[in-house]
Amino acid sequence: MTEKGSQTKPSGYDDYLRMYMEMVSFAKEELKRREKSPVHIPREKIDREFAGHNWVLLVDPRIGFNSRIIRFWINGFPPGEEENQWKSMGHRHTVEAVIYVLKGHGYSIIDGIRYDWEAGDFLCVPVFAWHRHINLSDEDMVYVASTTGPLSMGIGVAIYEDERYPEYWVFAQKDTAEKKSLIPGAVEIPDVQRGIPQEINPAQYDGSTAAKLYFDQLRFAEGEEEARRKGKVLVKGKDLKFEKTPMGWVAPVVDPKLGFHVKVMSTLVARIEPGKRSGAHRHLYEEVNHILSGEGYSIIEDKRYEWKKGDTLAIPVFSWHQHFNRGKEPARILVHTGRPAMENIGLMITQQGEVAD
């Protein structure tokens, strides 16, 4: 029995209040996480860890970064070999991937098609397409790669199938069709059941908005697979076209608006002439920079970070940032962002500060 005027808390009240306050406080806690996340990865650290290894993670939530979309690493393998000793298929994954070749020349087999590359070229690997890389040069092939692995893992749809580890395959071991499909599970059912099953006549549902929406859902996988195979894959470095923007000279590389079938990640290269500076801006998406040439510094929020060729910068979400070239040669910066993802969910905002020289 309670005292007059007092109220008894409903069962589970404290738990619900705690969970609600976790949501209310999330934004401020996220700011703290961004402030604690590493920003600058110097080349010396990368070289030290890369020695004796064929790959090193540079930006990843599992090594202390507050990255929710982008994973970035450096990879390499010896002359005359295939990466990871792959011999037939390589691997595939339900993440977007963009590769930039730093050193060497060779070719890749991606979804059964050969693409020849050399230093300075880019590869945009379609989601869930088997791919493997062959080094034809007389030196190590070295590349940096950016993928959307953290996002796929975070929402529970990450699938990585590697020819060396068939015991972990989820779909590839079932039959040849599953190995060729770019849509996980798409060919598990008979042909007549895929998309809109044959026994269903869409005409019987004319005028039904709900049915139209559902039929679009049934057709989506087939359209998605076709779009992945039609998307661009190879970009030659010699074909980059730098154009002037408020942020400076920029060459877009991989973008959904340029014929690439990407929905999460975009890639560009920025160029800053000696003694010049980029524009300043901030945006509500992740960004990872890798310095391809030059030396200088960046102001990220109120902190200064010195950089040179081979360094990496992980720009915290919604942090003001600007780059300065204090060297004698043009600075070129490889930029990967999660902008398309934020546009697709309606949370994209970019704010311009100082305009580039």
Q: Positions of the model-derived regions?
A:
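A structural feature that tracks compact, well-ordered secondary-structure segments
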Residues: 73-75, 267-271, 280, 296-298, ...
